[in-house]
Amino acid sequence: ALIIDPVLEKTDQYILLLNQLDLRLVKVIDTHIHADHISGLPELRDRTKCITLMGEHAPADIVSMKVKDNETIKIENVNLTAMYTPGHTNDSYSFLMNDRVFTGDALLIKGTGRTDFQNGNSYDSYKSLFDRLLKLPEETYVYPAHDYKGENVSTIGEEIKYNPRLQVSSAQ
């Protein structure tokens, strides 16, 4: 099994679900250093001996693996492609798996991650969104790290059409 962007307060729930489904946690990925919650990555590593992973720009020393842009991560018969998508933070990565993308906070449902703290940069965010994520096929499912409105999945096409933060004509 793989968990992306785990929250510390939910590690017991993750472990319970893994046990109920008789799964072994192989890897845990954080898409970026989070300011809004404490990552469950170290706790899951300690409790399951899984491999921990972040992008190469992450200033974290708790991970066993750092990936580069366009690098493929293999988990059993599943491949994820790392996509460097800075802007929300300078260490933000998204992960593409077939017809779905896990965007961390780079692209939220009908929103985008803030760029006013944690080495965020609005121009980098614009480039990550318009030159990377929104170039994916419109039917690609979007799974952000969290959503403040209770939604947990969208598509690139829906975001292009309905996301108010994407209704801009330039990076200005």
Q: What positions do the PLM features span?
A:
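Conserved beta-strand hairpin/beta-sheet module of binuclear metal-dependent hydrolase folds
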Residues: 1-24, 94-104, 110
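Generic anion/oxyanion-binding catalytic loop in active/binding sites
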Residues: 3, 33, 114
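Hydrophobic residues in well-ordered beta-strands that form the structural core
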Residues: 4, 52-54, 103, 144
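Short, conserved glycine- and acidic-residue-centered signature motifs
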Residues: 7, 37, 118, 122
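Active-site HxH/HxHxD metal-binding segment of metal-dependent hydrolases
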Residues: 8-84, 161, 165
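Metallo-beta-lactamase
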Residues: 79, 89-170
